[in-house]
Amino acid sequence: MGAYKYMQELWRKKQSNVMRFLLRVRCWQYRQLSSLHRAPRPTRPDKARRLGYKAKQGYVIYRIRVRRGGRKRPVPKGATYGKPVHHGVNQIKFARSLQSVAEERAGRHCGGLRVLNSYWVGEDSTYKFFEVILIDTFHKAIRRNPDTQWITKAVRKHREMRGLTSAGKKSRGLGKGHKFHLTIGGSRRAAWKRRNTLQLHRYR
């Protein structure tokens, strides 16, 4: 096994004494830093490489702190107006994962970079910490490499805002196999529309 395989096994055993200590110390360190800051290198090089990171020019890592828990509806004094069925303020669950929220915040802060992917690096009772891989699409090392030219296209701008990253697709219910029947045809809405539309063909 290579070194990265050993690192992967270390991260799989998060309840081991070594990892419990490491994660505890790192969470303390991340709490002292700002909620969004640039990391000099990936905390999990094995995971970052599996998600497309390369230790070369044009690749940037940002570490994001996201507050855990549900989403409170932002209404003044709890006044939602309308019918009682929509009066909920506190027990609202956000449709997307905290990881996709972290990607969105990184993408907003670094508008000139493209979000490639992200991964979990730690959590405590209040926060979750993610590292987001961003790519500078105007760097020659990225533009001249056939493997990374796809992300330099204009259509890839703000992938994280449109649910096109891995974390974003997960909350949209997209995937392959028998677990993803609800999105056959592109999306939940497309699948629902097809199943609930009566088609009366002329010759039937």
Swiss-Prot record:
UniProt keywords, alphabetically: Cytoplasm, Ribonucleoprotein, Ribosomal protein
A GO cellular component annotation in the UniProt record: cytosolic large ribosomal subunit
GO molecular function annotation: RNA binding; structural constituent of ribosome
Keyword Cytoplasm belongs to the record: yes
Function according to Swiss-Prot or TrEMBL: Component of the large ribosomal subunit. The ribosome is a large ribonucleoprotein complex responsible for the synthesis of proteins in the cell.
Subunit structure comment from the entry: Component of the large ribosomal subunit.
The protein, known as: Large ribosomal subunit protein eL15
Upper lineage: Eukaryota, Metazoa, Chordata, Craniata, Vertebrata
